[in-house]
Amino acid sequence: MGSSVNRYDPRNIETMELVYGKGYMSAGGDAEVARILTGIKIRNRQLLDIGCGLGGAAISLVKDHHARHVDALDIDDDIIRRAGELIEATDMDDRITLTRFDGGALPYHSDQFDVIYLTATSCHLEDLYGFFSEIHRVLRCGGWVVGGEWFKAADNSAYRDWDS
């Protein structure tokens, strides 16, 4: 594991949560989670939430959509700590596992997850080919990658190749 990472000023985290709702750092909240999952049944499925932020989506995936278990990753130590507090306060800590992850190979076995959920994550990455290769490795055959992004990195050739 690399050194401690805190990418967000705590005041910004608190402001985002005030604007977007408890447990969220991006727009939409639980309704956005439901929209992203439209047509995909996750009941009793194993999910990976990459870039879990404050844990709101992971909680919704378990509580509202009945995922069996969610492994949730984020790079920021303070955000992971805050997510852990929220997950514990909502009694979801037996169904949501938090891990600080700072890139490279995902710390999971191949073919481990039924669904990979990500929002506002890949837009922060340089090595999209490596990122999506790792997603492919840990996703079970027939699984789903679902999510949304703030923007498309048009100047990134790996993204253009993936997007075409």
Question: What is the predicted function of each stretch?
Answer:
Residues M1-E17:
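N-terminal, positively charged/glycine-rich alpha-helical extensions of SAM-dependent methyltransferases
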Residues S26-R43:
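Conserved alpha-helix/loop element of class I SAM-dependent methyltransferases that forms part
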Residues E14-A27:
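Class I SAM-dependent methyltransferase Rossmann-like catalytic core
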Residues L48, L54-A105:
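Class I SAM-dependent methyltransferase SAM/SAH-binding core
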Residues V115-D127:
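A short SAM/SAH-binding and catalytic strip from SAM-dependent methyltransferases
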